[in-house]
């Protein structure tokens, strides 16, 4: 299923006047925060499109991205910092507890080709933070780690979080 779509992006450059030039360019200065797809066709294997019996809208907002933009830019007044989903109130309680338990500090570094010790620590914090959130939502929805299907996926996520935890 597919159809016409639209995306909402935020221009994070100092002047905010790139006029869409950074959209879909993988630039950290332009972040997609929302998309809308007006589902009305099925994409056929021959490249054509067949109308669907029912039309609907698929839309989604990146909560963490919106929080990151608002918090990192000080409500759109300061564009000097790099926007990161992890430098927000969404992840700070998790990272504070990880700091307490591990004795290591999260410093918001980005990994390089040959990461140094702090970059490895920060990657571990981000992986564990993401996985804790995934586990929390999944378990709250009634999914338990197990040996088959989605339960096995959850088990693998848990094991990966533990593996990264051991690096701290």
Where on the chain are the PLM-derived regions?
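Structured aminoacyl-transfer and RNA-binding surfaces used for tRNA recognition/handling
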Residues: 1-168
């Amino acid at each position: 299923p597919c159809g016409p779509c639209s995306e909402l992006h935020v221009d994070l450059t100092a002047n905010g006047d790139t006029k869409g030039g950074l959209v879909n360019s993988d630039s950290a200065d332009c972040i997609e925060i929302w998309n809308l797809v007006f589902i009305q066709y099925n994409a056929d294997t021959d490249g054509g499109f067949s109308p669907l019996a029912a039309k609907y809208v698929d839309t989604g907002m990146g909560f963490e991205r919106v929080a990151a933009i608002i918090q990192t830019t000080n409500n759109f007044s300061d564009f000097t910092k790099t926007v990161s989903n992890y430098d927000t109130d969404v992840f700070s309680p998790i990272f504070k507890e990880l700091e307490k338990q591990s004795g290591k500090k999260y410093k918001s570094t980005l990994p390089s080709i040959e990461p140094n010790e702090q970059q490895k620590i920060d990657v571990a914090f981000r992986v564990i933070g993401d996985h804790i959130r995934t586990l929390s939502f999944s378990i709250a929805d009634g999914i338990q780690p197990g040996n088959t299907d989605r339960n096995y996926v959850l088990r693998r996520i848990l094991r990966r979080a533990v593996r990264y935890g051991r690096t701290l």
